[in-house]
């Protein structure tokens, strides 16, 4: 299925539209199934979205939230995605949400895979919404071009939910949801700001080569609808 592209005049407008779409998806899940699940990404880009979403009128006590990936640092580290979520999303009424971090204190990401996979498997699935980011190198979650084991992590039919990743250029070992885990969702949302990322997005759609631009594995599949939120 084609990627739906939504155009916005500012990143703040895109963040609000994304928050509205996620709140609608979570509300529909709560009404239909009594529980809802959301996967979010870290980095600096989603902060505005987090601030919009945390104000949504939801029964947060029935919402489960986890991460698409994590740098292998404790949540007190400034580079922690879990720390970012706690600081910017799990505030106010949203503190009632159930948050499942990926970092569990194990010595390495690989050492955490078995325990964290069991924890992930207990969440409401398929995930009701997945919010991804994308780097200018085409990575999404922590699925980086050139990383060892990338082909296995990008197998849409692979059995693993998680992959340990050592990015070739980015700091910190990572634990990432695999493509198969990300595709175990009802809808994938991809906010992209800036001309550079829009150009990478266009190349990924045109070439569909996930080993060069891993985000293409998300954009060029037909199992799960994808919406891109494009802003300057």
Regions found by a protein language model. Give the residues of each.
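Ligand-binding beta-strand-loop-alpha-helix segment within the catalytic cores
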Residues: 2, 61-131
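Glycine-rich beta-strand-to-loop/alpha-helix junction loops that act as flexible
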Residues: 40-45, 132-136, 193
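Class I SAM-dependent methyltransferase SAM-binding "motif I" and its flanking Rossmann-like core
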Residues: 136-180
């Amino acid at each position: 299925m084609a990627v739906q592209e939504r155009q916005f005049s500012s990143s703040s407008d895109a963040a609000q539209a994304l928050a509205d779409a996620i709140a609608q998806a979570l509300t529909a899940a709560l009404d239909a199934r009594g529980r809802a699940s959301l996967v979010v990404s870290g980095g600096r880009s989603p902060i505005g979205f987090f601030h919009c979403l945390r104000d949504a009128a939801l029964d947060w006590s029935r919402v489960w939230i986890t991460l698409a990936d994590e740098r292998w640092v404790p949540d007190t580290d400034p580079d922690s995605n879990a720390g970012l979520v706690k600081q910017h999303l799990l505030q106010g009424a949203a503190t009632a949400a159930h948050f499942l971090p990926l970092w569990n204190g194990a010595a390495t990401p690989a050492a955490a895979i078995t325990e964290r996979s069991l924890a992930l498997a207990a969440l409401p699935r398929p995930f009701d919404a997945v919010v991804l980011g994308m780097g200018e190198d085409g990575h999404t979650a922590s699925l980086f071009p050139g990383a060892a084991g990338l082909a296995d992590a990008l197998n849409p039919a692979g059995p693993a939910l998680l992959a340990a990743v050592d990015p070739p250029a980015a700091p910190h070992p990572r634990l990432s949801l695999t493509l198969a885990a990300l595709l175990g969702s009802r809808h994938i949302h991809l906010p992209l700001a800036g001309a550079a990322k829009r150009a990478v997005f266009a190349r990924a759609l045109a070439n569909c080569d996930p080993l060069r631009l891993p985000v293409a594995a998300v954009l060029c599949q037909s199992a799960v609808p994808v919406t891109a939120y494009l802003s300057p």
